[in-house]
């Protein structure tokens, strides 16, 4: 077990703050305090690992933990959150109190999962012997524990769902970036959504940092931590406490590699990273979204122009879990109906924050992500795919009935050299990978290349070969990739399946 700083403090108030112990008499809590040890676990450190013997129960006083199960391929699968006020390791401890080998003595059993601190956390530990002694003297403690275990069993698989992030770290990559004004604009946009938020630039008051952050979370819907990347205590603390990290950089700047040190803790896999590129004014500057995504190990890239406006509102909706993602299915000519869906959403004043799809649905989604208005989308789709036949360059059918040059030229004419990371909003297209039998999600690279892959109807258009893999129409394996959109963002998903 990796711990930091064992402490001997009055644990009765801490135990009384745990919800499932709130009805337990104070004398029982005082007895529990005599059997307990109070210590801290820094973010990313293990409380215990899978396979280690269990002889204690832990109570989370502040912070949070994540349970992870080791998979055969070496990955760690996230099993669920353990929040402040909940016990950890109770199942293994109770099971270990049974005589398994028949020698008349209770046996320890190994933990079946690893538990890591997701934030700087404080924990109370009570040994099995101490808990048994305590339960015999104060049965109400055991009754409370049984009620909690039964409640967890009723929850079943619901526990493995990730909780919505509440603490966001906005990390400037340069001291010349002033986040204050933009953070205030973001706070105003969140307020319009009915979301209470707090901007924090340092730990305030005399509380311990873990208790300070717990209080912030209880009092606010969203907490925004502002820091500048570098070797300073506040930056390191905000990185440990954040649920999601936003790397804020100038759009015309070049990243260094890597931005963050490599971490071996599976807890780091839950600290999802986004890149936020700042533009001055409405003009889009040449930027390097792919470089920033690689340098930060980021999942998404966003652009922010004017301090207040559509981009700020989109970020606020994304943070609040109120973003809107549209996903369009393939369907050949029927996919033109997606244009009507886009028009209807806009007429109703429903914003579109994410766009994606498969086959021709991805082409329409790409038009939306380019930032074109309704008339522009209709004009370009009509010109590129209706007024002339893009499949008219017939070929000896070796890999396709047509050569595909016309389609390539249409895509180049309308989408040019636009990179997916340069688009107005996060975008994806789905293609089918014939090499490994799975579908591929395109979220980086040339937009027209991703669209060419997702519309490569087998037997009609030649496939796209990318990095030695053969890609064809996304509709073959995932014609309506609503599941991909669900993974991309936490807000609403509007799907159109034709």
Predicted regions and their residues:
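Cyclic nucleotide-binding regulatory module and flanking cytosolic helices
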Residues: 2-43, 83, 92-99, 137, ...
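A small-molecule sensor/coupling module
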Residues: 11, 29, 102-105, 109-118, ...
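Cyclic nucleotide-binding regulatory domains
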Residues: 20, 43-120
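Helix-enriched interaction subdomains in cytosolic or periplasmic regions
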Residues: 122-148, 282-306
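Glycine-rich phosphate-binding P-loop
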Residues: 164-192
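Short beta-strand-centered segment that lines the nucleotide-binding/catalytic pocket of NTP-utilizing
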Residues: 192-205
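Patatin-like phospholipase
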Residues: 210-222, 230-356, 366-498
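Gly/Ala-rich beta-loop-alpha elbow adjacent to hydrolase catalytic centers
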Residues: 357, 361
